[in-house]
Amino acid sequence: MNKAIPVSVLADQLAESNGFQFHNILYHLKSSDYVDEKLLKSELSVLVVKIQKLLNSNSNYSIWKGCHAAVVICTYNPLVLMAYGGKLLDIVYQKLEIKVLQRSTNSLDAQGKQVLNSLVNAISVLMNLMRNKTGLSREFLVPKIKAIIPTLITLSQYEPELVLPILRSLIFKHTTTFKPFNAKFKVILTQFLTEGFDTLNEHTQKLVCDCYAYLHMVKTQTYQQQDEHSSHHKTFQDENWMNGMNAVLAEFKPLIELCGEILDFSQDEELTKLIGKMVPLAAESTSIFRSLTMDMNKSTTLYDIPKRIDVLSKMLMSFISVPTTYTIRIPLDKLNVTCSALLSITSKHIPIKRELRRDIELNATINDVFTKIQFAGIRLYSTMVSKFGNVCFSYLSDIFYALSLFIPFKEKSLNIDFEKCFALKREFLVVFDLVSKIIANVGHQLTDIDFLLQLIEIGLDLTEERSLIQNVFQQTNAKKEQELSKTKNKNKKDNKRGSLADLYVSGSQFTLACDLKTFDTLNKFFISIIANQKLATAQMTKLSRYAIFTAQTYKQNLGEVPTTFVELLRTLVIQPGNERVTILPMAVNIIKESSDDVFDILSHPRLPMSILHSIEKSTFDNGEDDEDDNPDLHANEKQQEYNDQPVERSEQKVVDFVLEEPVAVDVKTKETVQFKDGITTSEDQVDTKRPRDEEFIIEKSSSAKKFRTENQPETIPIGVSDETVYQETEKVTVNVDTSSNDNEDDEDDSDFEIPAIELSDDDDEDE
């Protein structure tokens, strides 16, 4: 067994180590060999002293090494955590406080920012390690956390992406401890929400909204004596949370009403009803946002409306999606009304006021603003469905109707404007993802699928490549000549402008191709539609062509087929809808190298052969036993069975039987065929004696009837049509030569197959 490197050796190397050597020391500190109480007071104590010395150094590099060493040794060595974790946390906090002071006075360089990140991460890890450990939490964490929280709040003004995740965790897990700092933190978050919110990246925006929502977990309201009329009312634990959520919902109504200055709401009674159902602003409430001002002469001021709605929608999404320590009530009906109202703000169904229609620039801005407002409603719907699932399906008709308002159409037409759809590609991907979640849980309950068919057309169009220079080639020759005539210096070469020759020579290079992420989202939507709805032939053909062509293209270019395309091909094969032609051969040819189990089973079905063999053997043995025991009884039972079950005239019945002696065959075209002893046939009618399971064919007429009997002569009824047919009985004599195989004693009881006796009542009737 290999012995670990002594801790004292690692401690001596720690201060002077650089690069790979330092990483190697951290690797060895993870070893469980050092979790030994004997080493705690000797070598491990020396190591901790070395780490403390690094943290107290003025060198940024030494502080950085000390942070990583403290995190590793406390994470993998519980003895060090219990004995020295509190001291290490105290030293790290002191260095963090100094760095925060430096950051507030002036900006840090790249190395200083890296050290600041290491200090913040070290404090976060050490606090998580001490949490839920009674002794450490009581003696070190709780006393120290009251000093750590204000320092982190101060730093959150400058480094929100770094600090807000830690503060969010502290609010959630130490709500009571965080209460004194609630007001200070709310001021900073309000500043982020009202000023410069759009300058933050999407992840940081979500952190700001989550922290603002978590502030409502802290009970800041003082106890008020209730009167006799309200003293019996039940108080809910989420009362403060509900107040914060309703305050955000109430901010939407004034913004929707402000859009009434642009659109003529009197033309849409449904929207007027929706606005009436929205949460109103409370009389005593104060908004954290300033009032908006719009100037129709400055169209850019209209963008303040979607900007404010974007902030409110993200705040509301945090209120309904973040986990809480207690149960909260979500007003789904109010959320549905708000989302429907946002998606109803469109100039396609509600006309713009007459005095604003002449300004082309203003109208273009209005349409763009309304699209952004609608997208806020789509994101709210997506969060609702993702969080609450089937509970939201009671609003399914409202959701689909509201989403259908987002589809752009050409002017004065019901045709989809695919160019605008491509410009709204990011927004439509959210729509496809939302509809996929709904359809997967609704199944075949939808009756009106016109909206889904429109989405299929849009999705297929988004998968096509777009040429960036398409408009260049659409200019007419007349326009070119007109432009040339206005040019003064026709023959003078413009050296300041580059050549446009590549546009004509290499036009295929100026294209926008669909990325794999878009394909994945669309394929999931197509799979949910195909699996849960029966589409018409036109849509199924388009989807099959798209899946086969794109999958084959990826296979040729990348050497493999993406997973979502394999799932789409599988769904098209298993769920063909009303189609009778399968794409299985083409799908198997495309993904034959992927070793897909489903296609392998469909291409090579495996039957339970052992079970089939045992059934065949059992049937044969039972037939011989019955024949040996009581052949006459067996024949009578068979005859009665077939008499009770007439054979249809239009079918061919083949019956195996065994001939021990020459038999007579009476062919009755009306009802039955009887076999009698003592009648033989000539050799020209029957060739030779044949083994069992073969057939003899006797031609009686052009219409053939095949029958098979087993073991004994029996009477077999032949089905007769509803018409009454009168015809005399004809006899056919059959001679069976049993002497041709005298040397084979074991074949005396062999089965013979008699050719089908062809009976034709139609021919006799014609005569």
From Swiss-Prot:
GO terms for cellular component: cytosol; nucleoplasm; rixosome complex. Residues 742-752 have a biased composition (Acidic residues). Residues 699-767 are annotated as: Disordered. It is found in: Nucleus. One of its GO terms (molecular function) is chromatin binding. GO terms for biological process: pre-replicative complex assembly involved in nuclear cell cycle DNA replication; regulation of DNA-templated DNA replication initiation; ribosomal large subunit assembly; rRNA processing. Pfam families: RIX1 (PF08167). Its main location: nucleus. Keywords: Nucleus, Ribosome biogenesis, rRNA processing. Component of the RIX1 complex, composed of IPI1, RIX1/IPI2 and IPI3 in a 1:2:2 stoichiometry. The complex interacts (via RIX1) with MDN1 (via its hexameric AAA ATPase ring) and the pre-60S ribosome particles. Belongs to the RIX1/PELP1 family. Component of the RIX1 complex required for processing of ITS2 sequences from 35S pre-rRNA and the nucleoplasmic transit of the pre-60S ribosomal subunits. Regulates pre-60S association of the critical remodeling factor MDN1. This is Pre-rRNA-processing protein RIX1. It comes from Candida glabrata (strain ATCC 2001 / BCRC 20586 / JCM 3761 / NBRC 0622 / NRRL Y-65 / CBS 138) (Yeast).
